Regions:
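Short, flexible loop segments at boundaries between secondary-structure elements
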Residues: 132-138, 179-217
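Conserved beta-alpha
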Residues: 71-154
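Short Gly/Thr/Asp-enriched flexible loops that form oxyanion-binding sites at enzyme active sites
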Residues: 119, 168-177
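Short glycine-rich anion-binding loops that position phosphate/pyrophosphate groups of nucleotides
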Residues: 40-44, 162-167, 189-190
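Proline-aspartate-enriched helix->loop->beta-strand connector
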Residues: 150-164, 180
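N-terminal nucleotide/polyanion-binding subdomain common to many enzyme families
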Residues: 1-91
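A short helix->loop->beta-strand "cap" motif at the edges of active sites that frequently abuts
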Residues: 33, 103, 178-182
Length: 251
């Protein structure tokens, strides 16, 4: 039984990245499709505003907190928080420690020219890969093609690397289509692991500053997310603290 901590309407798995990777790896490849989500501050704010999107996250088999900032703010607010297990860390652990010799993974998203470096860096067998077109989630035929690819290319690990909320919508549709395996909604994690995009230094990650590293590299795209939208998680945490009525011991 996976321990959970309820936070902002989601039952988060209270696992380290190592424990989360082991739990994911323990699922048989032929099991009915289930998916993992990795909400960060931006996701949690959007979920509070969009009940339909929140339902997709609640439908995930495993919900992992992807934000040390949210964890720290939650503790300051007196709200119990789960352990942090970032999507990038869990993905790296799966590729490095939980693949069988010659085992192939399925990837939906990620640029095709990044695949050789990803495979070379991590000793992967050639992945089964589908790169849907931009805006595929608004094109019924393209969306259906992505779902069909997941069904036609079963794997123990199916990495959905098309960004939130597209990957969560896709994961729910793949589950409804009767696929098998475990889907991982992991955003840019594979791009980091392929060396196509640099990840923040370890000390910045440990101090909850990965967002600042990414903002400095791409301010035009990320300024609104990190400076305007994500801070809205603070009143959500304070509201949760008030609803619970008393301080909870943080981790």
């Amino acid at each position: 039984m996976i321990p959970t901590v309820s936070l902002l309407g989601l039952d988060f798995a209270d696992l380290t990245a190592e424990q989360a990777a082991a739990a994911i790896a323990a699922r048989p490849g032929g099991a009915p499709f289930a998916y993992t989500v990795t909400p960060n501050a931006d996701h949690l704010v959007r979920l509070a505003r969009d009940p339909a999107l929140a339902a997709l996250y609640r439908g995930a088999w495993l919900k992992l907190l992807d934000s040390r900032v949210v964890a720290g703010l939650g503790r300051l607010a007196g709200v119990k928080v789960p352990r942090v297990a970032t999507g990038s860390d869990v993905t790296a652990l799966l590729l490095r420690h939980h693949l069988r010799p010659g085992e192939r993974v399925t990837i939906i998203g990620l640029r095709p020219d990044w695949l050789p470096e990803l495979a070379a860096r991590h000793g992967l067998a050639p992945p089964m890969h589908h790169d849907p077109p931009m805006g595929f989630d608004r094109d019924p035929a393209a969306f259906a093609a992505a779902v069909a690819f997941a069904r036609a290319h079963p794997a123990r690990f199916i990495f959905l690397a098309v960004g939130s909320p597209r990957q969560e919508r896709l994961a729910a549709a793949i589950a409804a289509a009767g696929a098998t395996g475990t889907g991982l909604c992991i955003g840019a994690s594979l791009a980091f692991l392929a060396g196509a995009e640099p990840r923040a230094p370890l000390w910045m990650r440990h101090h909850g500053l990965e967002w600042a590293f990414r903002l400095a590299r791409d301010p035009r795209r990320l300024a609104r997310r990190y400076l305007l939208d994500s801070p809205c998680v603070v009143p959500l945490l304070l509201r949760e603290r008030a609803a619970r009525g008393r301080p909870a011991a943080g981790r």
